[in-house]
């Protein structure tokens, strides 16, 4: 069975969905039961080239003018199933990704879709992908409950199947010497290394890091893509860091590879995720850090308090005093990392995808 994954972004491009697609492709290849390819834009690197995974790159802006070229490239690869990921950073507001299912449906190629977020696109585009889906996968629980009745009817047998995602962070077990070297790179001796990493948007609550941490004792490291010239929110973060009390106590690293992000998180005294909507099972960066044994502070709407199994303290969103107190009490506390947990999770995900792919081919034969 030949499976072609389609994604606008792919490592080393900064995109959570792109990283997810790379992890899924690698897990599918490891089953030794599929031929797996990825169609993506220029700039992608195939870090699994020796495994049998094929990454096809195409100069592409994902606009109307690219639709024919995308479709021809897909058909040339001769997939049994095309699996499109929605959305990705590279798609932006362009329309071609949303019309690919219709083009492939006319060519008789089954299209599986994964919806990583609730679909905010224009009404007719949501209708287009829903009407042309062979099967739909979602990574958020209770997704179907958010859908209108008419939309469920439109999906028919393609109604969403929930397959939880898993951390894309590389497993990391540092020696004490390796951890110390990383700490020395970011934090002066005697200061707590307090880290946030990921995308920086207002709903992530990154600005609260400057209220939770203490510039007298903490070195704040914010890892992720920064564009103060193009983002008013990023400018606001840069202004906070430029304040006299934070000027020497803040570092912006820019975008880090999965390996470097994992090493930084594993070396921290605390990693904080102050999301305004709370974390969920779909937040792979949070799940990944919680396997490293490092102390984590995360916001949540449905649970609060300390989880000893993952060394995580949960607070209500925007409860800055609680997050500040947790940092003071628990910074530097570590537990043994959950070695093997990430690999096992992706093996499960690959098995569930293969079952769905086979069912998709069976439903096509039955029509």
Residue spans for each PLM region:
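A charged, aromatic-enriched C-terminal amphipathic alpha-helix characteristic of glycosyltransferases
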Residues: 331-362
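Acidic donor-binding loop of glycosyltransferase active sites
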Residues: 265-280, 294
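Conserved donor-binding/catalytic core segment of Leloir-type glycosyltransferases
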Residues: 188-204, 210-221
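Short alpha-helical donor nucleotide-sugar binding micro-motif in glycosyltransferases
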Residues: 130, 255, 263-268
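Donor nucleotide-sugar binding/catalytic pocket of nucleotide-sugar-dependent glycosyltransferases
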Residues: 134-179, 188, 250
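Glycosyltransferase donor-sugar binding loop
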Residues: 41-44, 219-238
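Nucleotide-activated donor-binding/catalytic signature segment of Leloir-type glycosyltransferases, i.e.
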Residues: 234-259
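Conserved acidic donor-binding segment of nucleotide-sugar-dependent glycosyltransferases
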Residues: 312-321, 328-332
């Amino acid at each position: 069975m030949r499976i072609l994954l389609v994604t606008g972004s792919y490592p080393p491009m900064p995109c959570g969905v792109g990283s997810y697609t790379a992890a899924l492709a690698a897990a599918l290849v490891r089953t030794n039961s599929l031929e797996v390819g990825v169609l993506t834009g220029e700039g992608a690197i195939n870090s699994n080239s020796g495994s049998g995974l094929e990454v096809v790159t195409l100069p592409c802006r994902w606009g109307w003018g690219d639709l024919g070229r995308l479709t021809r490239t897909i058909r040339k690869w001769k997939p049994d199933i095309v699996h499109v990921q929605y959305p990705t950073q590279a798609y932006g507001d362009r329309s071609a990704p949303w019309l690919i299912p219709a083009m492939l449906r006319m060519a008789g190629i089954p299209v599986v879709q994964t919806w990583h977020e609730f679909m905010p696109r224009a009404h007719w585009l949501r209708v287009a992908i829903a009407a042309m889906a062979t099967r739909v996968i979602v990574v958020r629980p209770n997704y179907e409950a958010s859908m209108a009745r008419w939309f469920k009817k439109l999906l028919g047998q393609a109604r969403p199947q929930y397959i939880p995602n898993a951390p894309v962070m590389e497993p990391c077990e540092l020696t004490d010497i390796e951890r110390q070297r990383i700490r020395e790179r970011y934090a002066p001796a005697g200061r707590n290394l307090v880290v946030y990493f990921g995308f920086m948007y207002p709903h992530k609550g990154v600005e609260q890091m400057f209220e939770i941490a203490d510039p007298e004792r903490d070195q704040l490291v914010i890892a992720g893509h920064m564009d103060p010239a193009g983002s008013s929110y990023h400018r606001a973060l840069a202004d906070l860091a430029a304040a006299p009390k934070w000027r020497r106590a803040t570092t912006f690293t820019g975008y880090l590879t999965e390996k470097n992000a994992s090493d930084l998180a594993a070396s921290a005294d605390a990693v904080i995720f102050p999301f305004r909507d709370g974390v969920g099972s779909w937040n792979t960066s949070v799940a990944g850090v919680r396997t490293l044994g490092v102390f984590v502070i995360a916001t949540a709407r449905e649970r609060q308090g300390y989880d000893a199994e993952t060394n995580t303290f949960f607070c209500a969103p925007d409860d800055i005093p609680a997050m500040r107190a947790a940092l003071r009490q628990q910074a530097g506390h570590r537990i043994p990392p959950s070695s093997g947990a990430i690999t096992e999770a992706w093996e499960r995900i690959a098995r569930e995808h293969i079952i769905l792919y086979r069912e998709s081919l069976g439903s096509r034969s039955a029509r």
